[in-house]
Regions:
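Transmembrane alpha-helices and adjacent helix-loop boundaries
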Residues: 1-183
Length: 183
């Protein structure tokens, strides 16, 4: 137990000290490594300890990331920076797809508080619904993996097919700031 506490203290110290000594490129790279480490830990818990191979754990990670990207894109799509568009104030990919107003499901993402809430709650709710449906029917072994892969395919087709609302295959790009801080 003392070893675990020591590791936590060391990790916190490293995370507090690293921003002081690393340039922005290395700091962003370290952030990406830590983010992907969380995904890997989720796979280890699911497959390594639970014995359930999930080929779709990335959808929950991706949905959380997409929620943050929606907030960042709305922040980057203010009236000044989008003045050259046909419809100023909406994300550029929506303007390119002739969408003239911000869709209703994008509106709450103007709020950073809602975005942080959505990053956690939306993937949890989706995982609960999928898990409840599959585990109450005692789906296991390879069938769990096949169903998860099918859900990934469905979401991929949905996201790419709704390019005007989601950014399609390119996703949400050109994210520059978070509350005025360069990212």
């Amino acid at each position: 137990k003392e070893g675990a506490i020591g590791l936590v203290i060391l990790a916190v110290l490293i995370l507090l000290v690293m921003p002081m000594f690393l340039d922005i490129f290395r700091l962003n790279l370290m952030g990406k490594y830590l983010t992907f480490a969380f995904v890997a830990i989720g796979l280890v818990l699911c497959w390594g300890h639970g014995g359930i191979l999930s080929l779709g754990q990335g959808i929950f990670f991706g949905i959380g990331g997409y929620c943050m990207a929606m907030f960042l894109k709305l922040e980057a799509s203010d009236m000044q920076s989008t003045a050259a568009q046909t419809t100023p104030g909406i994300p550029d990919f929506m303007d390119w797809n002739q969408i003239t107003s911000l869709p209703g499901f994008w509106e709450p993402f103007h709020s950073f508080g809602f975005t942080l809430f959505a990053i956690i709650i939306i993937p949890i709710l989706l995982a609960f619904i999928i898990g409840f449906a599959m585990f109450t029917r005692r789906v296991g072994d390879v069938y769990f993996s096949i169903i998860m892969q099918a859900i990934v395919a469905i979401l991929t087709i949905l996201i790419i097919g709704q390019q005007g609302f989601t950014g399609g295959i390119n996703g949400i790009t050109d994210l520059k700031t978070l509350h005025g801080w360069d990212i």
